[in-house]
Amino acid sequence: IGAYHSTDAGRSWDRLTDRESRIGYPDAIIPHPTAIHHYFVGGAKYNPGQWRTNHDADATVTITRDGGKSWDVVAAGLPAHLQGNVEAMAMNAWDGGLALFAGTTDGAVYHSADEGASWTTVVEGVAPVSKGGHYYNLNEKPELVAARKTRL
């Protein structure tokens, strides 16, 4: 797993990251609204198969400013260790600024007003921001989430 890039409409692909990268399992990808080649990426160091065993995604947020050739962790203000994964990111851009939001499978939402240089906690303890079985794989007591996986 990793991040890939294509310049020919998907006929061929170049690997930008690999399993040894800080984000070996990229999930949320947000392009910068005005700076070409800038992307914010949230995700986990480990893949979902490993989450099932160790209940740890070791997630963070990174940015590339050169189309994926190099990546910088932008996690000041985030917990030192994110057990859950950053599965969703959103951006609100306006003339002269932008706000980034990151949601985790731990049920936390974080906000950055300075392009990821620093983060503040918006809320913790809400329902997990997750898809499919990802939350289930990260939870040490999966029997507690059975009700969350049903539909009314």
What positions do the PLM features span?
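Extracellular glycan-interacting surfaces
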Residues: 1-152
